[in-house]
Amino acid sequence: MAEIQFSKGLKEPVVPDIRLSRTKTGEKGSAEFYFKQPTILGDQQTEEITGMYLIDEEGEIVTTKVKGKFINGKPMAIEATVIFNSPAEWDRFMRFMERYGSENGLEFTKSS
């Protein structure tokens, strides 16, 4: 079980686009998530976005770097960023992504 939440206890079913970057030394990196029309922004939702929680059997990875995108005053997307300050944090994130990706049909593709 690997899932993403924006409010504790409320799974986000929309699968995001994810872009990864890492320094040449591998010491630091980041993951940028883009959710187009996530359910947390739907008309029926009343839950507050408190961060982005990546949850699996190892625990959770949390970021508060979460922004909403609005078009003509209507919420359309969420962008979130996770920062990695060590190779161990990167490795932990990649283990989460392997689980999340296999459950949601995501594939890892290196850029050219």
UniProtKB/Swiss-Prot annotation:
Pfam families: Psb28
UniProt GO cellular component terms: photosystem II oxygen evolving complex; plasma membrane-derived thylakoid membrane
Subcellular location: Cellular thylakoid membrane
GO BP, one annotated term: photosynthesis
Keywords: Membrane, Photosynthesis, Photosystem II, Thylakoid
Broad class of where this protein is predominantly found: membrane
Membrane topology value: Peripheral membrane protein
Family: Belongs to the Psb28 family.
Xref: NCBIfam families: PS_II_psb28
Protein name: Photosystem II reaction center Psb28 protein
Organism field: Microcystis aeruginosa (strain NIES-843 / IAM M-2473)
